[in-house]
Amino acid sequence: MPQTRDPTLDTLLDLDGQALVVDPAGRHWVRFVVTRVPVTPDKPHGLDYSLTLHGPDGERLAGFDNAHPVARQKRGEPQDHRHRLRTVKAYDYQDAATLLGDFWATVDALLRERGIIP
């Protein structure tokens, strides 16, 4: 049976190269790097992606990506994962819409915790 194309993938791909300010003071921003790549064991979804939230000094506060191995992994091969401050955890990629929803939920939570947004 042929694999069904993710109908939300174009939305994610359209964000490639975008940087958006996400707080009223203009001090926090998000960046999207999303490209199609051949399907490989390292990139089983055919995507190379990095969705990141940055603070006033440019430091990464949160991110979702699949560009490098997760430190605690047994064999160290790359996999989907998320960063939140200094914590890195595996991320179970489902589809583009879920990735975007999870990313924006993390952004909102961090900005609320820091008192940036109500």
Model-inferred region functions:
Residues P2-P78:
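The feature represents the first ordered module of a protein
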Residues L47-Y49, R75-Q94:
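Short, surface-exposed secondary-structure junctions/capping segments
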Residues D65-H68, D80, D102, D108:
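Acidic side chains
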Residues L85-I116:
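Well-ordered alpha/beta subsegment
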